[in-house]
């Protein structure tokens, strides 16, 4: 199982969301077995991160060693804009 670490901004966003329990559950599933949610996971082109689809939300994450870094949680439309 991977250790989950959230960016500070992600924690603030997560507290405001109605679907926070569902999103946290999916993140925990991903940490337990990164291959279990394969159909909802896609590697982002030209970036080191991947995305996890949770209904209309996108969880942007990366795995470094034994750590699952949650970099951002965004609504579907703005998840793929280049920063």
Stretch-by-stretch model annotation:
Residues 1-4, 9-17, 22-24, 31, ...:
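Enriched for short, Lys/Arg-rich terminal
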Residues 28-53, 80:
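A short, surface-exposed loop/turn module that caps and links secondary-structure elements
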């Amino acid at each position: 199982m991977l250790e989950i670490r959230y960016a500070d901004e992600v924690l603030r966003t997560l507290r405001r969301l109605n679907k926070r329990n569902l999103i946290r559950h999916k993140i925990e599933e991903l940490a337990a077995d990164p291959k279990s949610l394969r159909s909802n996971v896609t590697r982002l082109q030209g970036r080191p991160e991947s995305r996890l689809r949770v209904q209309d939300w996108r969880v942007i994450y990366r795995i470094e060693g034994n750590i699952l870094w949650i970099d951002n949680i965004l609504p579907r439309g703005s998840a793929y804009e280049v920063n």
